[in-house]
Amino acid sequence: MARTKQTARKSTGGKAPRKQLATKAARKSAPSAGGVKKPHRYRPGTVALREIRRYQKSTELLIRKLPFQRLVREIAQDFKTDLRFQSSAVMALQESAEAYLVSLFEDTNLAAIHAKRVTIQPKDIALARRLRGERT
């Protein structure tokens, strides 16, 4: 007879657990009676990777136009009241703001990867800004 390789098996030891007949029967009958199907869920990270690919392909602006315009007007009001903006000026500001944020998040992600992490943290943003020579 040929030798077979032995594999380690987990043994619980001690007494065998007592069977609970009432709860098992209730569990088996519940799904068939209700017929409620669990909603489909993707594994963690799948949707995130899909969104990354989607937004890297696209060129449209990601910040909504009106909230950004309100923010620009609110900030400008601190410097001078009754300022008017051409729509093209607000669009140029939004383009440059989004380009800056994308670039900052790229550098932040590199800082997180350098620290052997996949999750970005505020200290990564601080490091990226410091390396760029920006004020903190």
Swiss-Prot record:
Gene: HHT2
Organism: Mycosarcoma maydis (Corn smut fungus)
UniProt keyword annotations, A-Z: Acetylation, Chromosome, DNA-binding, Methylation, Nucleosome core, Nucleus, Phosphoprotein
Modified residues (N6-methyllysine): 5, 10, 19, 24, 28, 37, 80
Annotated region described as Disordered, given as residue ranges: 1-42
Entry-annotated residues carrying N6-acetyllysine: 10, 15, 19, 24, 28, 37, 57, 65
PANTHER family cross-referenced by the UniProt entry: HISTONE H3
Listed name of the protein: Histone H3.2
Post-translational modification: Phosphorylated to form H3S10ph. H3S10ph promotes subsequent H3K14ac formation and is required for transcriptional activation through TBP recruitment to the promoters. Mono-, di- and trimethylated by the COMPASS complex to form H3K4me1/2/3. H3K4me activates gene expression by regulating transcription elongation and plays a role in telomere length maintenance. H3K4me enrichment correlates with transcription levels, and occurs in a 5' to 3' gradient with H3K4me3 enrichment at the 5'-end of genes, shifting to H3K4me2 and then H3K4me1. Methylated by SET2 to form H3K36me. H3K36me represses gene expression. Methylated by DOT1 to form H3K79me. H3K79me is required for association of SIR proteins with telomeric regions and for telomeric silencing.
Sites bearing N6,N6,N6-trimethyllysine, chain numbering: 5, 28, 37, 80
Assembly and interaction partners: The nucleosome is a histone octamer containing two molecules each of H2A, H2B, H3 and H4 assembled in one H3-H4 heterotetramer and two H2A-H2B heterodimers. The octamer wraps approximately 147 bp of DNA.
Sites of Phosphoserine modification: 11
